[in-house]
Amino acid sequence: MTQRDPSALTPEEIQKEALPGESWEAAARRIARKRAEAGKSGTPPKPQNPTSAKAAPIIRLPFWPESQRGAPNEIVRSALFNARNRKQKRGYLANVDVYVIGDGSITYTGEELRQDDETVWLHLIHLARNTPPGELVEFGPHAFCKAVGWDASGKSYQRLRDCITRLQATALGVYSKRLKEGLSLSMIPFFRWKNAEGHALKTYQVRIAPEMVEFFGEVHYTQFEWEQRLALPSGLASWLHGYFASHREPFPVKLETIREGAGLTMERLDHLREKVAAALEALRTVGFLVSWRVEKDLVYVVRA
């Protein structure tokens, strides 16, 4: 049997042994060096803090594969990023209660957020997952637009800046039984895309709120397939993708609950029924659902 190289590190090992404020790369080098030295001396490496290994605080966002994205459960079960058409006029919300399906409550101040804003936010969180909370995350607009399924054009760059600016000018309050106390934060506290002369930079910079780590927690977040989301129409289908992904075995849900959770404004149930059916069929087409049905205004789905 081939033995694993003791200096080869998994992301989970790096996260467990990293020191507060230590960059991902620095932690990997330090841990690998310590293991290599221990291997030469024949002495097994000691944990950084053996007395508190289980109680060590989470200092980074969770790690997930490149093919996936992650979001706190309360976000994907709420109307924070609603499913309305992104081209419709957006309202400004001042300390408004956001509808949440299940436990928890959210208050929000800022310009109305849609599913395209969530797509951008999800990829920003993805890029930040290897970076200590509060440190700058850098990326090029060309690569970012490609990663979220947009064409790399000046129009897309402007759309990207608009989305991040909306996320920056926010005040989000989250209250849940699992949190020791409520969280209040800006979703993107810092965003730089132009220099002092007003010219666009080749590399954009953002900073994710450190409190976001606590919001994710150890297990209270949803991972879902990124390519599936990008293949879906942006709107109700992408919202339902996140919502149903947050349940291993989704239970039946009322049409009215979907309407409120997705932040839709249509009142006629027949119109809502048609819209939900089209979105569910899109989820089946991309391979997320095996089957679905709407019976007596209850939605039943079976995940793949």
Question: Regions from the language model: what does each represent?
Answer:
Residues 1-304:
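Charged, alpha-helix-forming regions
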